[in-house]
């Protein structure tokens, strides 16, 4: 009898629990305040994310760490910002923090603020080639530093631990 092509066997749960795990979730915010249809879709999205994370925790172990891209504040400040800007994301992480997950900031404040500034400058456009080159050079430098900061933090996760990383962009490797 021939073997079925494309069949992937399900890994044993105990094997998964011994490994490092990083769960990436797209941090979708409410870009259309007051639009009830969009808010309904957001609620569905975040409810689905929470359910999927619950299922992962049942089989692969609890989430030890929670990171949110763009957040350099400690949890008390970050949670207030999330409450104002993305209550669905806050709801998803708040229950996990209360049950023992450790929220950790993923960004360095100075680095992140410089990234915002260089991004804004780049969006203005350029008349001179020199200004463009200076901006590109500084932007690349700050992006490289940021990537190292995030990479080092994520590499601190130990075998058997799990982390949730709420990302705003798809630029992480």
Language model regions located:
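Compositional signal for N-terminal targeting/processing segments
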Residues: 1-173
């Amino acid at each position: 009898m021939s073997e079925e092509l494309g069949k992937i066997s399900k890994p044993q749960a105990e094997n998964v629990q011994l490994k490092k795990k990083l769960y990436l979730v797209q941090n979708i915010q409410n870009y259309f305040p007051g639009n009830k249809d969009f808010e309904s879709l957001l609620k569905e999205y975040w409810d689905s994310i929470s359910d999927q994370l619950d299922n992962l925790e049942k089989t692969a172990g609890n989430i030890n760490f929670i990171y949110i891209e763009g957040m350099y504040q400690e949890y008390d400040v970050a949670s207030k910002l999330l409450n104002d800007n993305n209550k669905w994301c806050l709801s998803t992480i708040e229950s996990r923090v209360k049950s023992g997950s450790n929220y950790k900031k993923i960004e360095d404040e100075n680095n992140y603020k410089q990234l915002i500034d260089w991004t804004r400058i780049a969006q203005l456009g350029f008349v001179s080639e020199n200004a463009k080159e200076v901006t590109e050079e500084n932007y690349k430098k700050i992006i490289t530093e940021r990537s190292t900061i995030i990479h080092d933090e994520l590499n601190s996760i130990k075998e058997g631990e799990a982390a949730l990383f709420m990302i705003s962009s798809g630029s992480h490797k």
